[in-house]
Amino acid sequence: MPRIIGIDIPAKKKLKISLTYIYGIGPALSEEIIAKLQLNPEARAVELTEEEIGRLNSLLQSEYVVEGDLRRRVQSDIKRLISIHAYRGQRHRLSLPVRGQRTKTNSRTRKGKRKTVAGKKK
C-alpha cells in the first residue's frame, strides 16, 4: 500500500479511485491532480514509482487542504458560526438540520435516536 501524506491508499485500485481515499479529495479533484502531474489514470497505485509518490506528496501538501488540516478548518468554521450566534451555528448547536430541511418528520440522522414522549390524554 503506497503511503501518501500519511495515508495508506489501496494498492490494487486504479489511481483515480485510490486518491479518493484521502479526506478532501473526490473524483473530480483526483482527476485534476492526475492531469497536473501527468500520471496515467488507469495505472494502479502500486505501480507508482518513489519519484511519482514524492511529487504527489509535495503537490498535495503545497496546493491542497486535505486530511487533518481540512477537518480542523471545518470544525473551526462551525465553532465560529456558533460563537457569532449565526442561524446556522444555532442549528449546529442544537443538532438540527442546517440547510433548511423539514424537521416535523424525518431528519432522524441529525436528531439521533427517537425519544418517546407521553401521548395526549383524551
UniProtKB/Swiss-Prot annotation:
Coiled coil: none annotated. Residues 93-122 are annotated as: Disordered. It comes from the Bacteria. Keywords: Ribonucleoprotein, Ribosomal protein, RNA-binding, rRNA-binding, tRNA-binding. The keyword tRNA-binding applies. InterPro entries: Rbsml_uS13_C, Ribosomal_uS13, Ribosomal_uS13-like_H2TH, Ribosomal_uS13_bac-type, Ribosomal_uS13_CS. GO terms for molecular function: rRNA binding; structural constituent of ribosome; tRNA binding. The keyword tRNA-binding applies. GO terms for cellular component: cytosol; small ribosomal subunit. It holds the Pfam family Ribosomal_S13. One of its GO terms (biological process) is translation. Part of the 30S ribosomal subunit. Forms a loose heterodimer with protein S19. Forms two bridges to the 50S subunit in the 70S ribosome. Belongs to the universal ribosomal protein uS13 family. PANTHER family: 30S RIBOSOMAL PROTEIN S13/40S RIBOSOMAL PROTEIN S18, SMALL RIBOSOMAL SUBUNIT PROTEIN US13M. This is Small ribosomal subunit protein uS13. The lineage of its organism: Bacteria, Pseudomonadati, Chlamydiota, Chlamydiia, Chlamydiales.
